[in-house]
UniProtKB/Swiss-Prot annotation:
Gene Ontology annotations of biological process type: photosynthetic electron transport in photosystem II
Predominant subcellular localization, coarse grouping: plastid
Function summary: One of the components of the core complex of photosystem II (PSII). It binds chlorophyll and helps catalyze the primary light-induced photochemical processes of PSII. PSII is a light-driven water:plastoquinone oxidoreductase, using light energy to abstract electrons from H(2)O, generating O(2) and a proton gradient subsequently used for ATP formation.
Keyword Thylakoid: yes
Protein name per UniProt: Photosystem II CP47 reaction center protein
Membrane recorded as keyword: yes
GO molecular function: chlorophyll binding; electron transporter, transferring electrons within the cyclic electron transport pathway of photosynthesis activity
High-level lineage: Eukaryota, Viridiplantae, Streptophyta, Embryophyta, Tracheophyta
Ranges annotated as spanning the membrane: 21-36, 101-115, 140-156, 203-218, 237-252, 457-472
Keywords associated with the record: Chlorophyll, Chloroplast, Chromophore, Membrane, Photosynthesis, Photosystem II, Plastid, Thylakoid, Transmembrane, Transmembrane helix
Compartment list: Plastid, Chloroplast thylakoid membrane
Family named by the database record: Belongs to the PsbB/PsbC family. PsbB subfamily.
GO cellular component labels: chloroplast thylakoid membrane; photosystem II
């Protein structure tokens, strides 16, 4: 036929058998990629420190999604929570990967079978003897089956009735674990941070899908609507399918970037807004005040702060700090976190407690400014020493650490104080190993950032794809010069069957 590369899909337009074959092959590729990617990530993943080197710091992409729906154990004897396990069962990380690769192989074979045996009686209209698909009926079948799957996931898997549940954690990502979830049927179910809404929405959407599927199986579309929406043209299916996919991609881009119960920070890392709003800093401050009210010293109060919570309060874990074109995991940037040095508390010689202004998300450099509790500037690291009034040396700033590895240690040497003030701009101060991975010191984004960027980008591309194919199917007669009321089932540019010796050969 001599088709150009961008028109090769024409060969499956009027060929239901091979249309199924290429979709089977596509699903085989998707499933095979998922399984292979899981095995690769498991080969490079280090589960030894779930607090300071969690999966999202290591750039894991598919492991968080498996963990989210209840897979936490490995045949290697470890679990996501850091425990050792003796019997991981069949549904371990490796088991899920193997299942996907096995499915991929079976789909590959079935794609080949359908490509070879394309001309089945099933695909021929009994009245005309020509290839035909009952697209409204197929729509009903798919709607019904996806509704059953959706309902089953919500009613059984998430609730723990027949399944493990899903990953549940506290608002600060400290106590996460897989557990069953009760559906939330009230207004609270619409709160994106309430896990019960995930169960109730899957159950409700599943029931709706089942009912809608049965409706489309039992009720034929009116003839005028059938013709108006081009329901007999498979490109209509393509257009509406692309619409469903791009809409879903936009939605999950939002739930990932802004955060929700479906994207726990223990699995995907914190959001940029948690840094912007001082979310973890406020929780740490609340805990310190509570401990002080109990009569504990500052050192004792800070020693009670979980290292995990302190690590979230560090700008290097902000997904917006890594450039989109800086490849690699977070660990390849600032390094592998080894330990928390403690909270740096600054004072001037007059006894004012000073706080370092934190670096905003979109700054690469930021002046070192220390303010008191009223926001008045008391000290800084000046750019021009000749004009300085608030330099660390002039003001006599000292630093003392509470909690962490330097608990109780103080410094009054100006160069050391300035070093820690500069590091305090980035949140809580941690020690990093940059040698192991040859980390370059340039921040990277987390899987949260990559997922959002990828899905938002593809959603935009798919949006244009929906417009393109929708226009092609609606205005097909205008574009192709084919009368829409023509009885013969033909496609412009596809009158013969490619590779079929029984079809008449003619120039197009």
């Amino acid at each position: 036929m001599g088709l150009p590369w961008y028109r090769v899909h024409t060969v499956v337009l009027n060929d239901p058998g091979r249309l199924i074959a290429v979709h089977l092959m596509h699903t085989a590729l998707v499933s095979g990629w998922a399984g292979s990617m899981a095995l690769y990530e498991l080969a490079v993943f280090d589960p030894s420190d779930p607090v300071l080197d969690p999966m999202w710091r290591q750039g894991m992409f598919v492991i968080p999604f498996m963990t989210r729906i209840g897979i936490t154990k490995s045949w290697g004897g470890w679990s996501i929570t850091g425990d050792t396990v003796s019997d991981a069962g069949i549904w371990s990380f490796e088991g899920v990967a193997a299942a996907h690769i096995t499915l991929s192989g079976l789909l590959f074979l079935s794609a080949i079978w359908h490509w070879v045996y394309w001309d089945l009686d099933l695909f021929r209209d009994e009245r005309t003897g020509k290839p035909s698909l009952d697209l409204p009926k197929i729509f009903g079948i798919h709607l019904f089956l996806s509704g059953v799957l959706c309902f089953g996931f919500g009613a059984f898997h998430i609730t723990g009735l027949f399944g493990p549940g899903i990953w549940i954690s506290d608002p600060y990502g400290l106590t996460g674990k897989v557990q069953p979830v009760d559906p939330a049927w009230g207004a609270e179910g619409f709160d994106p941070f309430i896990p019960g809404g995930i169960a109730s929405h899957h159950i409700a959407a599943g029931i709706l899908g089942i009912l809608a599927g049965l409706f489309h199986l039992s009720v034929r579309p009116p003839q005028r609507l059938y013709k108006a929406l081009r329901m007999g043209n498979v490109e209509t299916v393509l257009s509406s399918s692309i619409a469903a996919v791009f809409f879903a991609a936009f939605v999950v881009s939002g739930t990932m970037w802004y955060g929700s119960a479906t994207t726990p920070i223990e699995l995907f890392g914190p959001t940029r807004y948690q840094w912007d709003q001082g979310y973890f800093q406020q929780e740490i401050d609340r805990r310190i005040r509570a401990s002080r009210a109990e009569g504990l010293s500052l050192s004792e109060a800070w020693s009670r702060i979980p290292e995990k919570l302190a690590f979230y309060d560090y700008i290097g874990n902000n997904p917006a700090k890594g450039g989109l074109f800086r490849a690699g995991a977070m660990d390849n940037g600032d390094g592998i976190a080894i330990g928390w040095l403690g909270h740096a508390a600054f004072k001037d010689k007059e006894g004012h407690e000073l706080f370092v202004r934190r670096m905003p998300t979109f700054f690469e450099t930021f002046p070192v400014v220390l303010v008191d509790e009223e926001g008045i500037v008391r000290a800084d690291a000046p750019f021009r020493r000749a004009e300085s009034k608030y330099s660390v040396e002039q003001v006599g700033v000292t630093v003392e650490f509470y909690g962490g590895e330097l608990n109780g240690v103080g410094f009054n040497d100006p160069s050391t104080v300035k070093k820690y003030a500069r590091r305090a701009q980035l949140g809580e101060i941690f020690e990093f190993d940059r040698a192991t991975l040859k980390s370059d010191g340039v921040f990277r984004s987390s899987p949260r950032g990559w997922f959002t960027f990828g899905h938002a980008t593809f959603a935009l591309i798919f949006f244009f794809g929906h417009i393109w194919h929708g226009a092609r199917t609606l205005f097909r007669d205008v574009f192709a010069g084919i009368d829409p009321d023509l009885d013969a089932q033909v496609e412009f540019g596809a009158f013969q069957k490619l590779g079929d010796p029984t079809t008449e050969r003619q120039g197009i």
